[in-house]
């Protein structure tokens, strides 16, 4: 993928405002809360995948991995193929959860009995519903759960889990952790993520994801909130995030650039 061209400082600032907000992080600094389970929702962002495995291993709690084969699974296949260590894992035709379970077991030495696999879900709503069903079947008492997801989908995922368990008297306490907070900056040869890391989105895909995410989070007729599709609980969108998103949508240089570069 060629380097993403230069963007204005104003546009970069708006991108990072939206991206930081979407990557909901309920922690400051190190994770000091002891959980009863870590849920890793299937995605293709290697630092996020590694973060979930690291937490589960350090806390010695079950790692519930959720993800079947969906419209974005090919991005995970690509990420694994390009990774210098994980590329030995077989991907073609396999569910996301099966692939991520191999990473957790083979590379993070998480015992098989501590890896719970949900390999039927194909979207965010099913990730939440099917994961909650597995938790309800667990012999262990699950009170506190750390949910880890692609940072661009982290806030929506949390709102989805809260919607699924809205009417449950003893629902777990959901805590959100995206693994890292994405940030774009102008580099000497174009725009890129800082700090650099393996297994991230292309800049084009990242921008497409974050600009497409806010309409889903709205609580209106077209959104996913209670007044729309009712997939998620109501989400308050801060004014600065809304303004930043509007700026990106009205930035013709950016939209033209994204349209000209196939994802």
Describe these PLM feature segments.
Residues 1-200, 255-263:
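A structural signal for short, hydrophobic/glycine-enriched beta-strand patches
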Residues 23, 27, 105, 215, ...:
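Generic surface-pattern signal
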Residues 181-249:
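A conserved mid-domain beta-alpha-beta active-site/ligand-binding segment of alpha/beta enzyme cores
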Residues 239, 246-248, 252-263:
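Active-site cores that bind ATP or allylic diphosphates and position pyrophosphate for catalysis
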């Amino acid at each position: 993928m060629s380097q993403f061209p230069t963007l204005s400082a104003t546009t970069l600032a708006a991108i990072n405002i939206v991206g930081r907000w979407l990557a909901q992080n309920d922690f400051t600094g190190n994770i000091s809360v002891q959980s009863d389970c870590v849920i890793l929702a299937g995605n293709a962002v290697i630092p996020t995948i590694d973060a979930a495995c690291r937490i589960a291993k350090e806390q010695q709690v079950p790692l519930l991995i959720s993800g079947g084969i969906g419209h974005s699974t090919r991005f995970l296949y690509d990420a694994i193929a390009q990774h210098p260590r994980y590329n030995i894992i077989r991907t073609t035709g396999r569910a996301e959860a099966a692939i991520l379970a191999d990473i957790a077991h083979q590379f993070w030495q998480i015992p098989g009995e501590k890896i719970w696999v949900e390999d039927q879900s194909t979207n965010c709503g099913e990730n939440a519903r099917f994961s909650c069903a597995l938790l309800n079947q667990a012999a262990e008492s699950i009170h506190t759960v750390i949910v880890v997801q692609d940072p661009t989908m982290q806030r929506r995922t949390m709102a989805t889990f809260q919607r699924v368990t809205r009417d449950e008297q003893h629902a777990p306490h959901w805590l959100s952790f995206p693994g890292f907070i994405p940030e774009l900056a102008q580099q000497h040869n174009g725009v890129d993520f800082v700090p650099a890391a393996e297994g991230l989105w292309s800049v084009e895909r990242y921008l497409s994801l974050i600009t497409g995410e806010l309409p889903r989070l709205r609580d209106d007729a077209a959104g996913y909130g209670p007044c729309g599709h009712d997939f998620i609980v109501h989400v308050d969108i801060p004014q600065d995030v809304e303004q930043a998103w509007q700026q990106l949508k009205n930035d013709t240089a950016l939209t033209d650039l994204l349209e000209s570069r196939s994802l």
